[in-house]
Amino acid sequence: VPHFAVDLSHIDEPHKHPALKEAGEFTDIREISLNLPREDGGLLAYSRAIAQWHKTHRFCGRCGHPSEPKDGGHMRLCTNPDCNTQHFPRTDMAVIMLVSSGDKVILGRKKEWAEDRFSILAGFVEPGETIEGAVAREVMEEVGIPITNIRYHSSQPWPFPSNLMLGFFAEAESETINIIDDELAEARWFTREELLDEAKAYAEKPHSVSIARRLISEWTLGIEP
C-alpha cells in the first residue's frame, strides 16, 4: 500500500494555514508515537527521517551541484551530468546500554536535563568500531567504569534526526563513578526498588516509545536476557 508524507516544517503554524486548518490536528511526533501501534510508529519514524534527510541534503556532497529526489524519495541524484552521483539516506548508529551491578543500575543526567531526570548511558558508534567496542568505550568515557558480559537486546529507530539505537545490557566491574567527559552533570546508582513503580507503569504500556525506558523496566522486573 503506498504511503505519502509531506514536510510542513517550513510552516510556523500549520493549523492556521488556509489549506491545512481543516486537515486535522498537528502534534509533536514524540508525543503521538506513545499512543501508536508499533507498525504505525515505525512508518512515522521512517517518514520523519526521510523528510529530514531531503531537507538537509539538497546538494551533492561530491561536486556541490543541486540534487533531486528519485525513486519515490528513497534516493537523490546529482543534477550535474558529469557527476550523476546517487545519494541514499544516512543512518547514524548509536549504542544505548543499561549497566548493572548486582541489584543496582547506573543512570546519568545530562547538563541540560532537569535535576530529577536520569537515563541510561548512550553514545555514537565511531567509524571502524564494533558495536560491542562502542558500548565499552562510551561507558568508560562517561562514567569511568569497565564493563563485561555485554548482551544485545533490541534496536529502535530514533529519527531525531536519523539515528538507529542499539540496546544492550552489560555488567560493571567496578562501582566507582568517575565522570570523565563533560556530557553528564552527574551519574549515580539506582536500586530496583527505586525504579519499580515506573517499571510497572511501563509494563502496562507496551507501545511506549523509548528503548531506554524499555531496558530499564525489563531489568527492574527481572526479565533481562
Q: What residue ranges belong to the model's regions?
A:
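Short acidic-glycine loop/turn motifs at beta-strand connectors
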Residues: 1, 101-103, 174
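Nudix hydrolase/Nudix homology domain
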Residues: 1-57, 68-70, 114-118, 180-225
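Conserved hydrophobic/aromatic beta-strand scaffold that supports enzyme active sites
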Residues: 5, 59, 77, 96-98, ...
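Cys/His-rich short segments
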Residues: 45-98
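N-terminal strand-loop-strand
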Residues: 76-119, 124, 146-147
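The catalytic Nudix box helix
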Residues: 119-154, 168, 174-176
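Acidic pyrophosphate-coordinating catalytic loop
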Residues: 156-165
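Non-heme Fe(II)/2-oxoglutarate
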Residues: 164-187
